[in-house]
Amino acid sequence: MSGFLNAREVAKRMVARERGTIIFTGATASIRGAANFAAFSGAKMALRALAQSMARELGPRGVHIAHVIIDGMIDTEFIRTNFPEGYAKKQQDGILNPDHIADQYWMLHCQPRDAWTHELDLRPWMEKF
């Protein structure tokens, strides 16, 4: 619900200016459910549908809407502390670097309107998909 409410409010100003970017962050669960993840998967799938609908509605009005699927662990203190076996993959570029994710978000924001990306999957090279 927060994705919808926040996007609705900022979209009003962006539509008035005929420009802007809204990026929703999804997960693997945005496209594939898993056992014991029904609530999370349902919410992420709904967020993806919201992004797709808003892209179709607001794109023609100059607002770029993108959905980014983050498919893998992100190098954070939480991961380092709670998932040391996952963090060990860092040595092989096996977890996502937050700065590299930010670079991709900035790239989406800077895209020219004639070549907008509406969905982007970010995953380490060794992550299964």
Where are these regions (language model features)?
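Catalytic loop of short-chain dehydrogenase/reductase
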Residues: T21-A46, A51-Q52, R56-P60, I74
